[in-house]
Design a protein with these regions (language model features):
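Preference for long, solvent-exposed alpha-helical segments and helix-linker "stalks"
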Residues: 1-185
Length: 185
């Protein structure tokens, strides 16, 4: 059972008082906070929780470096999900997603590519960015998408030709199929 309210207090204590104790603080924290955001109707609390969620990603990169582009991508995607109703929120999410994309390049996740494009599109619609910016981004993303589709298709094919995949290999195959589907959406 997902009782986010009960999980939040001990998680928050560790996050604030022992931030380097375990990486699990940063792996499970976003799930707990997103569960609380989903289950609250109090707008002020939602805003505070979104701020906390963003802080989790920042602190994860500070205390557990090595996956900065990936973590920035998750941060940017969540910023888009929760802050897309304001131009300032869109600009902030777009900036974070751009940073993730620039760091990761061909290794960007499909969700980063999708959210980056959606945020840019909304900023063009709001007349904050120009259509030319969207066209340039489309060109940049198209190359990465083509590369990822080819690589994922090959990885999936190779895995499906292998007999007796380990559970880890089966999880990777499932993840690759999901990523390929997301690229196509």
């Amino acid at each position: 059972q997902k009782n986010y309210e009960d999980a939040y207090k001990p998680w928050s204590y560790l996050f604030n008082n022992a931030p380097k104790r375990t990486k699990n603080i940063y792996l499970h924290g976003p799930k707990i906070i997103k569960g609380l955001i989903k289950n609250t109707s109090d707008q002020a609390r939602k805003t505070t929780l979104v701020d906390s969620l963003i802080m989790v990603y920042d602190q994860r990169n500070a205390y557990y470096p090595g996956k900065e582009a990936y973590v920035l991508g998750m941060k940017g995607a969540d910023m888009y999900k929760y802050m897309k109703t304001t131009t300032v929120g869109l600009q902030a999410s777009c900036q974070v997603l751009r940073g993730s994309f620039e760091m990761a390049g061909n290794e960007s996740t499909a969700s980063v590519l999708n959210y980056y494009f959606m945020a840019t599109t909304k900023l063009v619609q709001a007349k904050v960015l120009k259509v030319e910016d969207l066209i340039a981004l489309f060109s940049d993303l198209s190359g990465v998408i083509s590369y990822k589709e080819a690589k994922l298709t090959q990885d999936i094919y190779n895995a499906e030709q292998t007999e007796g995949l380990s559970s880890k290999e089966q999880k990777l195959l499932k993840k690759n199929k999901k990523e390929l589907k997301t690229l196509g959406d």
